[in-house]
Amino acid sequence: VFRTGAEDKIIYVLGYDNKARWKKALGGQYGCLYIDEINIADMEYVREAAMRCDYLLATLNPDDPNLPVYSEYINRSRPLPEYVDDAPTELLGMLSEPAKPGWVWWYFSFDHNAALTPEKRQQIISNVPAGTKIYKNKILGLRGRATGLVFSNFDRKRHVISKAAIRKR
């Protein structure tokens, strides 16, 4: 219970890693719902919880753009006019579902993390191979899914060993 000057507010903290935990929210109505990493949350949970709240706030890391959370929620939001230029045009083009009035989309990139010193930021960037899915998602902040080769630096001549070469070992 959070006590304000005028009234008490009840705060529920629920996990969504399994249905038994989040089903505790059923039957309730909530003023504000916060879902961290909505892109990995169970979609049944997201749908059920979202319909029970007045205000939904969610975070996510870029993921497979074909996940239902994008078509049902994220791509129905729009950036505020004064922040449109902050987002990559690639992502703005994906906000293609009919807009929901009042649904706002905010874009934050790796550069917005004020807790990182320039040195720490560079250390993290240098530890992620450029051209990989994780670089695109985590460093550039763009959506994407793994397709084709898992490692873009894969070289068949260098990384594939023939049976004959194995026998020689």
Model-derived features: where do they sit?
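Walker B catalytic acidic pair
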Residues: D36-I38
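Short, well-ordered loop/turn elements at secondary-structure boundaries
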Residues: G28-Q29, M51-D54, R167-R169
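Inter-Walker segment of RecA-like/P-loop motor cores
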Residues: V1-G31, R143
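Catalytic micro-motifs at enzyme active sites that drive phosphoryl/nucleotidyl and oxygen chemistry
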Residues: R21-K23, M43-R47, I161-K163
